[in-house]
Curated annotation (Swiss-Prot):
Name of the molecule in the record: Pimeloyl-[acyl-carrier protein] methyl ester esterase
Catalytic reactions of this protein: 6-carboxyhexanoyl-[ACP] methyl ester + H2O = 6-carboxyhexanoyl-[ACP] + methanol + H(+)
UniProt lineage: Bacteria, Pseudomonadati, Pseudomonadota, Gammaproteobacteria, Enterobacterales
GO terms for cellular component: cytoplasm
Domain called AB hydrolase-1: residue spans: 15-242
InterPro entries reported in the protein's UniProt record: AB_hydrolase_1, AB_hydrolase_fold, BioH, Carboxylesterase_BioH
Gene3D superfamilies: alpha/beta hydrolase
HAMAP family the record matches: Carboxylester
SUBUNIT field: Monomer.
Superkingdom, taxonomy of origin: Bacteria
Amino acid sequence: MNNIWWQTKGQGNVHLVLLHGWGLNAEVWRCIDEELSSHFTLHLVDLPGFGRSRGFGALSLADMAEAVLQQAPDKAIWLGWSLGGLVASQIVLTHPERVQALVTVASSPCFSARDEWPGIKPDVLAGFQQQLSDDFQRTVERFLALQTMGTETARQDARALKKTVLALPMPEVDVLNGGLEILKTVDLRQPLQNVSMPFLRLYGYLDGLVPRKVVPMLDKLWPHSESYIFAKAAHAPFISHPVEFCHLLVALKQRV
């Protein structure tokens, strides 16, 4: 049986769907869910194959987006962190009528480094895939440590992420590999040029996975979108800067 785990909180007049990143689950939002559910009708989701959404194998980005949409409200602000940013972006491209605004957090339309495009070196992603087969819990923990490196609260932020992972059964190796394959191969830079709805991109200045060099490049490529960089955050700004993070989302709500 493959069901998407979905939790709804709050009674705001605007719906906000939160999509987590690779290897994690919706528990990662517990640091901000109380605050956000006082402003929005908040939807917490475990992506297919992650957390409590069991029974899924590796999915393509398009199939992952379709699976998530099955239980989604008719219209919402879609927020995706990291890999979740690609899923939210895919939903905008295929079902724009279901989206009030798009928010990507520490996400890139193309995570993999390409010619004249900063990103994660393909051999690093391939290395993660190889190591998953050998010792996947350690590999996931390594990936989490990368996400908080360099911040003033790096240790406690990494602990918060690790606690999220360990709170629920680990995803299957093929699901984790499928997620890495999406990060390695997907490129939405051109398709997202045509997005006309409110589009907010949030970044961490210290992010080791999504280099800040992509921000001005995407400002130019997507002039209709807005970007904001958390000066002292890495890959998880909602954990290191929860108050500032929520403030930006509440401000966006006033504009949709």
